[in-house]
Amino acid sequence: MSKSQSTNNQHNNGGNVLELRNIQQKYFDTKTRKDSVVFDNFNLAVEDYPGIGQFVVIMGRSGCGKSTILRYWTGLQKPTSGEVFVDGKPLAENQSIPMVFQQYSSLEWFSVLDNVALPLTLKGVSKKQAREHAMEMIKVVGLEGHENKFAKIPQLSGGQLQRVAIARSLVANPNMLVLDEPYGALDGFTRAKMQFFMLDLFQKSEIANLNPTVILVTHDPREAVLLGNDIYIMDANPGRIIKHIKPDLPDKRDKSIRKQPRF
């Protein structure tokens, strides 16, 4: 990744990098024939720490609105009322934040290389440049040698396809990335490997220099503590934050972290 690219995606200095303000969310429940309240005057502010990336984890039981929060910030859903801010500014109609879902999503008739290059080509980057930058990101996520394979099973495993999705989300150098239970569909062994892959990835200089903010939704408390600098625990009816935790663990972590008594 070129230095000129990485400097285009810096957070504001201080303040909140992501914020939800006075959010109301209702929908009509066809079973009860009444309005159901998801959020009632809900507020959440994720602080910006200039010069470092951060991993924010949102946990909570089903129905508390975790994925809805992600959809607000990515522009996939609007609240009934309230304000959504990104980098201190109202979320714009044409603004986009990349999102990786539980079920990996790829264009199966495209190669891995062309899947990863797609966000750049959609932005008008030449095919040659897009492929060059895509190849750099493919190396970062450990898929070098697979770039010419079709992005589908059985040519790639489920874990490899999630790496393709992550590489595609990062290739345009975003300063934010949203992950909605990205490992939920994987078996336990692959899930553990992907957790450490993500930990290693965001400590690599190619990614860390972008100082990204990553928002992860998970049900797994061990995953939350392993990856998160900030952990928000939610409850439902209506959705609300009941606890905010900053794990007493070093920002730089590796596999040995799970052997520490504090973990």
Regions found by a protein language model. Name each.
Residues 128-147, 197-203:
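Conserved ABC ATPase "signature" region
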Residues 152-156, 160:
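Conserved ABC ATPase signature
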